[in-house]
UniProtKB/Swiss-Prot annotation:
Keywords: 2Fe-2S, 4Fe-4S, Biotin biosynthesis, Iron, Iron-sulfur, Metal-binding, S-adenosyl-L-methionine, Transferase. Catalyzes the conversion of dethiobiotin (DTB) to biotin by the insertion of a sulfur atom into dethiobiotin via a radical-based mechanism. Binds 1 [4Fe-4S] cluster. The cluster is coordinated with 3 cysteines and an exchangeable S-adenosyl-L-methionine. The lineage of its organism: Bacteria, Bacillati, Bacillota, Clostridia, Eubacteriales. Homodimer. Transmembrane segments: none annotated. HAMAP family: BioB. [4Fe-4S] cluster binds at residues 62, 66, 69. Its cofactor is [4Fe-4S] cluster; [2Fe-2S] cluster. It comes from Clostridium botulinum (strain Langeland / NCTC 10281 / Type F). Pathway: Cofactor biosynthesis; biotin biosynthesis; biotin from 7,8-diaminononanoate: step 2/2. Its EC number is 2.8.1.6. Belongs to the radical SAM superfamily. Biotin synthase family. One of its GO terms (biological process) is biotin biosynthetic process. This is Biotin synthase.
Length: 318
């Protein structure tokens, strides 16, 4: 019996793999690995696909120095900068996406964390949106304190997003203005406030597969509900502008391994899909059951109607 089949049976019996067991399947055939990851997804999660979209609610002028990010004030990138979008703009975007068939909508803001006035402004918007539209509300506003996270929950937000980005070991190579533990504290405070958690990272930063596996195990320890996997799309003007783009095989392998490590979560194909050959079709057959549709924060994405057609053709329910 191959290790893939052996560990699939273990997972379907309700057990979790150890890091050593995951390392035993690293060199297995990628096609077999992806197919088995998809079988695990279908058995434990069904065919329901979770589709979300985001809006850049505050752009640029960020004081953090994340090397991949176009919004950092430390780098010379050609992006539009603006403060918090007005309420009508956010609400209209949410309604438009809901009418297209999107399940979740997230306002994402630049900066280490929003200030009190900005939290107040967005909480009012979320409250209006909750009364106006049935789309599920997510938020991504940086390293907020518990009190602000509770205010978001009370205004209608159901899920908070804060990416770990990579492993603890590799994190200092991409950011030095805040710490890995700052992120973990925020995630724990969001859970304490009653929010679900969406947390994942970016692959292709120069990290190893071991780093990705370490991140996945940390996410498992944190009991997150959704794991977005972004593929680095190198941005001109950032320190990673010349970073080599990952091969599609490496992307598929990473997604499949994440399903083996995180058998019941929503694994969400996120940013960077436009740089792979088929908009992520093969990736969606590798254990994935969620995606961000539409444009990203500072880069173009996939049109939602195109996404839904592809997702349904793969046998998912949207």
């Amino acid at each position: 019996m191959s290790n893939i089949i052996k560990y699939k049976k273990k997972i379907l019996n309700g057990d979790l793999l150890t890091k050593e067991e995951v390392e035993e399947i690293l060199e297995e055939d990628i096609t077999d690995l992806a197919a088995t990851a998809n079988e695990i997804r279908e058995s434990l999660c069904g065919n329901k696909f979770d589709l979300c979209t985001i809006i850049n609610g505050k752009s640029g002028r960020c004081q953090e120095n994340c090397k991949y990010c176009a919004q950092s004030a430390h780098f010379d990138t050609d992006i539009i900068e603006y403060n918090i979008l007005n309420s009508d703009r956010i609400i209209n975007s949410a309604i438009s996406n809901y009418n297209k068939g999107v399940h979740r909508f997230s306002v994402v803001t630049s900066g280490r964390a929003l200030n009190n006035n900005e939290v107040d402004t967005l909480c009012k918007t979320y409250s209006k949106l909750k009364e106006t539209c049935s789309i599920r509300l997510c938020a991504s506003h940086g390293l907020l304190k518990y009190e602000d996270l509770k205010r978001l929950k009370d205004s209608g937000v159901t899920r908070y997003h804060n990416n770990l980005e990579t492993s603890r070991k590799f994190f200092t190579k991409i950011c030095t203005t805040h710490k890995y533990d700052d992120k973990i504290e925020t995630i724990k405070n969001a859970k304490k406030a009653g929010l679900e958690i969406c947390s994942g990272g970016i692959i292709g930063l120069g990290e190893t597969m071991e780093d990705r596996i370490d991140m996945a195990f940390t996410l498992r320890e944190l009991s997150v509900e959704s794991v977005p996997v972004n593929i680095l799309n190198p941005i001109k003007g950032t320190p990673l502008e010349n970073q080599e783009i990952l091969s599609y095989e490496e992307i598929i392998k990473t997604l499949a391994l994440f399903r083996f490590i995180l058998p019941t979560v929503q694994i969400r194909l996120a940013g960077g899909r436009t740089i792979i050959s088929d908009n992520g079709k093969k990736a969606l057959e590798s254990g994935v059951n969620g995606a961000i549709s539409g444009d990203m924060l500072t880069t173009l994405g996939i049109e939602t109607s195109e996404d839904i057609k592809m997702i349904k053709n793969l046998g998912f329910e949207v």
